[in-house]
């Protein structure tokens, strides 16, 4: 096991449930988010202003509509492909009607994406659910079924491409080469994600929205009680990013983001692999096994 992997693994295992860094991050939005009167807008053009978005809704909902486009400093020199916004209406809304009428409207030469707003509590608990399961080169499994199985075989020893998997009674099943597995047409597998990155930050970096991000959170152990719990703030260093639209060139997306620096880490990017439907679930070690973070 390399020194880098051992160091990263030990740092995670030594965290206590009482560590201040594990406390959930305070919301960065000024808008009080209530899904009954607030919507989330993704894929907002950099040139778009709060007033530009407000004018889109004023005719139907009146001048009391308020818009917030959070401003964030990017110290790594990377400028995200788009911004996001929160729109708050003066009364309760019919979300489906708003989505039908305003989703994919073009503002400043860019389609906006209307999504349901989620409270900070919902964002902490919620996970992306989609169709099919994806496996990345580092052995991530089942991320888009709402259940996460960390595909590691032991501390610091994660499976790489097409690694053989254990079957029942210790019998190994024949491995399936990665290049023979079906690739996703709209999803990227991202490795070496900063441990403290949130779904919203990942979404902003890739120019999409939080609902299109699968960001597995770490399993950790309370040093005092021995209890295993899911971290509120530390992810497992990997993510899956899905891009919406009918004409997504996922190979081009992979090339666009390959080698980009997010936070202080250079990302490893690949097109996600779709896990076969008959691929059996495995019970893997939930602790002491983390992705390499150099």
UniProtKB/Swiss-Prot annotation:
The modification Phosphothreonine is found at residues 49, 91, 119, 242, 287. Keywords: Acetylation, Cytoplasm, Methylation, Nucleus, Phosphoprotein, Repeat, RNA-binding, Stress response. The modification Dimethylated arginine is found at residues 135, 137, 141, 145, 153, 155, 159, 161, 165. GO terms for molecular function: eukaryotic initiation factor 4G binding; mRNA 5'-UTR binding; mRNA binding. The modification Omega-N-methylarginine is found at residues 125, 145, 149, 161, 165. GO terms for cellular component: cytoplasm; cytoplasmic stress granule; nucleolus; nucleus; P-body; ribonucleoprotein complex. Present with 12800 molecules/cell in log phase SD medium. Functions in the transition of mRNAs from translation to an mRNP complex destined for decapping. High-copy-number suppressor of decapping defects. Overexpression suppresses decapping defects in both DCP1-2 and DCP2-7 mutations. Acts to promote translational repression of mRNA in conjunction with DHH1 and subsequent mRNA localization to P bodies. Promotes translational repression of mRNA during glucose deprivation. This is Single-stranded nucleic acid-binding protein.
């Amino acid at each position: 096991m390399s020194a880098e992997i051992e160091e990263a693994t030990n740092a995670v295992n030594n965290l206590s449930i009482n560590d201040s860094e594990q406390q959930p991050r305070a919301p960065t939005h000024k808008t009080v988010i209530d899904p009954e009167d607030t919507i989330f807008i993704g894929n907002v053009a950099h040139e778009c202003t709060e007033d530009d978005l407000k004018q889109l809704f004023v005719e139907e909902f009146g001048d009391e509509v308020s818009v917030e486009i959070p401003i964030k400093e990017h110290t790594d020199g990377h400028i995200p492909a788009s911004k996001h916004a929160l729109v708050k209406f003066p009364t309760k809304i019919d979300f489906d009607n708003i989505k039908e009428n305003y989703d994919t409207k073009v503002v400043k030469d860019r389609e906006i994406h209307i999504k349901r707003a989620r409270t900070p509590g919902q964002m902490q608990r919620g996970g992306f659910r989609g169709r099919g399961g994806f496996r990345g080169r580092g052995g991530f499994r089942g991320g888009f079924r709402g259940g996460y199985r960390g595909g590691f075989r032991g501390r610091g020893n994660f499976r790489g491409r097409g690694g053989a998997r254990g079957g029942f009674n210790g019998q190994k099943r024949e491995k399936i080469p990665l290049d023979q597995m079906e690739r996703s047409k709209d999803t990227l597998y991202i490795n070496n994600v900063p441990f403290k990155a949130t779904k919203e930050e990942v979404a902003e970096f890739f120019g999409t929205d939080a609902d299109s991000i699968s960001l597995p959170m770490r399993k950790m152990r309370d040093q005092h009680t021995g209890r295993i719990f899911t971290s509120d703030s530390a992810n497992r260093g990997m993510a899956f990013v899905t891009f919406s639209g009918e004409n997504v060139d996922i190979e081009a997306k992979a090339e666009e983001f390959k080698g980009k620096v997010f936070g202080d880490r250079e990302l490893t990017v690949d097109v996600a692999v779709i896990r076969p439907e008959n691929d059996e679930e495995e019970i893997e070690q939930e602790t002491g096994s983390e992705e390499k973070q150099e």
